[in-house]
Amino acid sequence: MTVDPVLAINQNLGIAEMMDYVGQLQDEMIEHRRDLHAHPELLYDVVRTSGKVAELLEEWGITVRRNVGKHFGMGVVGLLQGLAGNGSTLLLRADMDALPIREGNELPYKSVNDGIMHACGHDAHTAMLLGAARTLAAFRERLSGTVIFVFQPAEEGAVKSPRDGRLLSGGRDLIEDSVLEGVDYAYALHVMPELPVGTLGIHPHYAMAASSHFKVGFQGTSGHHSAPHQAVDAIQMAARYIGEINGMMANRIDPQEAAVLAFGTLQAGTAINVIAEHSELTGTFRAFTKRTVAAITNGLQRHASAIAESYGGKYKLELREGITVVNNAEAVQQVLHAALAVLGEDQVILLEQPSLAGEDFGWYLEKVPGAFAFIGCGNKEKGIVHAIHQPQFNIDEAMLVHGARILVRLAIQHNGSASGKQK
């Protein structure tokens, strides 16, 4: 693995002292993570979580901006100005929201909110960034430039804006409220149980796919099964649509480009002997290039229109396009250097295959250079093997220190100074 030698850090910066400080915060980070895990909140409804985060940042002397987000106002942003002079502005992001999943783990800190669970590690992401924020605040005399700590709601989905009706995830909501103003680089870490604790994986270019959601409604006319010629069957329109879209994915999308589409729900009908007048399909599709996303989007529209016309019905298509997470080459080098220093060379992996899962950190990386990396949280010996979004998902909490140390090193690599002492 080749790492740019110009990223080498002079040891007189006291990096070892800062790494030790992070280690001393291990129990505190575990406590924060478990508290958040026990009290998960969904999407933009992160009142308790955001309040806790803001209070801690303020306690550590970090300037806090609450209620961030042009449309929903549930984000928290911490601003730390280094005291060693001017430098670049670095953004470090963690997501705060949980998932509508009933937890399957029997833990002392099991979710108290039935049907809601931190099954994607956002509790860990928040705890790691809190640890990094406290450390950098304690050593701000050694820091030049600015570090922005972004705690984001609603990574797991989009909600219709009360302002303009658009479907917005938390990343877009915060970006529209100027969180990227003046930012030079942006970074985020995400837990990955497929990687053992003590490791980090990163893709050199594409990290995650653009994950887009769609909903198609077909409107026909109801009628009795004895007289199908007097009705327009919305179930038949939906069934034909499923077949045609699957055919489109097999025959009209470039097989050299990774793409996948799947239907998730189909709702139709009210009685066993009545032709359904309405049907509704939902699903997702995932791809990496704008060309493929456009091809699928156009196909969804074209086939819905043609089917509705051929049956004499109507249709409505709603679409929320995702965005690909594209890592910047220089930022990847920064992550590699930080991870190698924290974990060791054998523990850092250049991932060959990008993930077809989605992540709205792509909206950040569309605007500014940066990188998105995966930090190992699995431990087979402890039975921590379940994938994200599963009821039995868990993490080896030793990864919290690893992640916080990597985030701290990223800040120092961009904005380190040899002067100053711990506050």
Q: Can you describe what each PLM-predicted range is?
A:
Residues 4-118, 127-145:
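Acidic/His- and Gly-rich active-site-bordering loop/insert found
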Residues 91-93, 214-217, 372-377:
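Non-cysteine beta-strand/loop elements that form the S-adenosyl-L-methionine
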Residues 74, 105-117, 123-124, 136, ...:
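Histidine/acidic-residue-rich, glycine-tolerant segments that coordinate divalent metal ions
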Residues 36, 92, 122, 149, ...:
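Divalent metal-coordination and catalytic microenvironments
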Residues 3-10, 236-423:
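Metal-dependent amide/peptide-bond hydrolase catalytic core
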Residues 37-39, 44, 118, 122-125, ...:
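Histidine-centered active-site/metal-ligand motif
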Residues 94-99, 192, 209, 266-269, ...:
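Short glycine-enriched loops at secondary-structure junctions
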